[in-house]
């Protein structure tokens, strides 16, 4: 819902219809959000009307070519791709993307729904690159499981009453939950903890010779293996009692709680080692 509103506002503001998104992206399952998701299997014929061009992540020349005619209303990109396998946009790419969007009057939308709220070791993942988008979409961690979403909108946009609406964006109970989340995050220094424990975990995982590549930031980590991970995940779950996510066939996705301690990380590493060698 947050991404739907962001895309809609970008189109209202620019008067344009086309959107640029990136390969392996995931932005949602409804209407415009599913159309800018790079998975044709979940895009129904009903959703196909939106003009979307998918470009390779980190290919700034492709972006410049796509935006040169100044007919694109928005570029939407995840702070870190989650479903796509924990793909981290390069810092220089994000900086150049900001410049190209500004030069062509294109709205830059940062989807921080999975990568935001401290997950990456900063409040929003794009802050690692030091850029300022035109809109930031957020949900998931915003309510710590309680349904709520939101769009952070630049002063560039002039609000018009009734232009946008949400089901999950403004009810009193959800907002109370979101405020409580912020209080706990600040009081327990969870963003700093995600950075510290995440760096520790990534360093330790890089020592495993069986792993092809480690990607991610903070406590948003992708473990790419040389072989399919189904058997490894089953061993972790049923034998080691460790639940993990996945992306595709070869990537284990780690999204642990932001209060994960080094002791918790060591326990995971021990059980991960057991599963690898079982």
Say what each PLM segment does:
Residues 1-278:
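Conserved N-terminal phosphate-binding loop of PLP-dependent enzymes in the Aspartate aminotransferase
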